[in-house]
Amino acid sequence: MMTRFVFGQKISNKALQYSSRVVITYINDLKGDMMMTNLTRRQFVKLSAQAGTLMGGLSIIAGCNNNMSSQSSDSLKVGVMGPYTGDVAQYGLAIRNGVQLYVKQFNANGGVNGKTVDLMIEDEKGDSTEAKNVYEKMLDAKVLAIIGDVTSTPSIAVAQVSANDNMPLISASATAPAFTSFGHNAFRATMTDDFQGKVMAKFAQKQGYKTVGTIYNSGGDYESGINKIFVEECQQLGINVTSQQAYAAGDVDFNAQLTAIFATSPDAVFCPNYYQDSGKIVTQARQLGYKGVFLGADGWANMVDGDDKYASPEDLEGCYYNCPFIVENDNDKVKDFVKAYHDEYGKNPSNFCALGYDAAMMMCAALKTVDDKGDVKPGTEEYKQALIDAIAQDKVDGVTGSIAFEGTGDPVKSTLVVTFDKGKQKVFQVIEAK
């Protein structure tokens, strides 16, 4: 039963209908009383006016209830959640920009058969509890689907609660394998931690590295997850992992861990952390005299483009990381996206902007697929399932590569190995989808 808080009290539609009948009965009784008693016409008019005012108020409240419980017939509401304040806000804001750009273009080109896609955007501050609160808020607002969350830990929290509601969910960037494990409703536009760990271990083998060390944030699902898979894959490939060094979230001095790794003389060091930590680690390693190779994962995105407070282009020279998108990629679709993004925001997009763009592309394609069939009504359980089925079956040609699904919410897609050459990023190798 639909309920809404009105003037500080929860009033149900059933209660509104009952109250309306009471007022109508009251007015009819007044008419009878006027005929059977000495009630004057002036008194009757006054009491009738009061009853009419009450009836009008109930009508307004009922109208508010109806408006709040349904979507406009010419729009489709989609939630967008992420960290727009806090320590990881740069990722959330980048994805939000990409989502908004694609939806703007999509609506300008006719939307979903004339219907616009409207976005409900909410900040979860990078916190799992807040992310679940935002999810409940979106549920109350009757969104049809959600693009989110962004980082792995809040994304897992949302995926857990959304599975019971069968809410269609697309994360642009959550890489933790568990994100898609709770139900068939959750999908991602990016690669998994497992995929990245294996890709970089195989890359190390192809580069001829016989020994590697690792340094990672033990408090992060993303960092520790990729490190674990990388180490396991290296062992399978015959690469000796000489030292694994963990650090705590928030640490800024990595000299002890780096010194321990360098004492084992590895051919390369794997550093699967977000770019703030990774940049500091590379910088401190160079200060310690290490001139060797660092390997990274997609959290390295944003390391360059003038962000020299973490690592300089000179310090990053000859390092490698995997990532599905860089602006330097000489691809026509990428070039068009970079131009459109720069025109909209006055700066170049990052990997996370591109993933947000592709996540919105996936969602809008599914919305149109369902609308084209026209056999289910938005807001129903049947509509949610139809949307989930459409996401699973549609294939989109995104700016981070083609995205398709084969039985799970994890995409089959290509990625890039990126290197740093004379202060600039460039594509070193394309890893094709299997």
For every predicted segment, state its role.
Residues M1-C64:
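N-terminal secretory signal peptides
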Residues V23, L30, M36-S48, C64-K434:
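Extracytosolic ligand-binding ectodomains
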